[in-house]
Amino acid sequence: MSIEVFNESGYDGVNEEALIDVAQFALMRMDIHPAADMTISIVDEPTIEDLHVRWLNLEGPTDVMSFPMDELTPGSGRPDADAPGPAMLGDIVLCPAFAERQAHRAGHGLGHELSLLTVHGILHLLGYDHVAPEEERRMFALQNDILADWYTDLEERGVSYGPKPTGPGAFPTAADREALDQDMIKSTVGGMLAEPTDRDKS
């Protein structure tokens, strides 16, 4: 399983090793075939804003976007599954500048926020969505389970990319995230989001 990270954001504080680790864990947890590949692109706000408008017709920057390619479904890595051969899952695009402000409002650090967004993006690559309320609840519950299990797995391996956050925004429900989205929108001043203070980049 190959996961490539392309950091074109010029943003400090992005732990690429952690992103690869959580992505590999999520794909294994979803039983994705080990021959599958994906990329993680890390970009600045103007770039993701352009993608947001061009692909979703939504103004303003965002935290994560997913661009699926080959269709792989959960369970494709099981011994009894048909062997699909090498496949390119697609690309996840992350914006750390936006994500850091979002993390500040949620009460945790950039590292955890990017890990959460990586899992979220992978679930989108695998066909999960949150348009309908029930789908949204199911997707966010799965996202939180994967993320929590990843922290447990890190502890068992003796690896740490920062402490596991315990605040209410660390493993959000769909309703929690919707409230955060609204808070981010309200914080927009003159087209730019207000910068947080005293940020934890772990």
From Swiss-Prot:
Places the protein is found: Cytoplasm
Keyword Cell inner membrane on entry: no
Principal subcellular localisation of the protein: cytoplasm
Any Pfam family matching the protein: YbeY
Cofactor note (record): Binds 1 zinc ion.
Cytoplasm listed as a keyword: yes
Binding locations of Zn(2+): 120, 124, 130
Essential cofactor(s): Zn(2+)
Signal sequence bounds: none
EC number: 3.1.-.-
GO cellular component annotations of the record: cytoplasm
One GO molecular-function entry: zinc ion binding
InterPro entries the UniProt entry points to: MetalPrtase_cat_dom_sf_prd (IPR023091), YbeY (IPR002036), YbeY_CS (IPR020549)
GO biological process entries: rRNA processing
Assigned keywords, A-Z: Cytoplasm, Endonuclease, Hydrolase, Metal-binding, Nuclease, Ribosome biogenesis, rRNA processing, Zinc
Family: Belongs to the endoribonuclease YbeY family.
Entry function: Single strand-specific metallo-endoribonuclease involved in late-stage 70S ribosome quality control and in maturation of the 3' terminus of the 16S rRNA.
HAMAP family cross-referenced by the UniProt entry: Endoribonucl_YbeY
UniProt name for this protein: Endoribonuclease YbeY
Gene source species: Corynebacterium kroppenstedtii (strain DSM 44385 / JCM 11950 / CIP 105744 / CCUG 35717)
Top-level taxonomy: Bacteria, Bacillati, Actinomycetota, Actinomycetes, Mycobacteriales
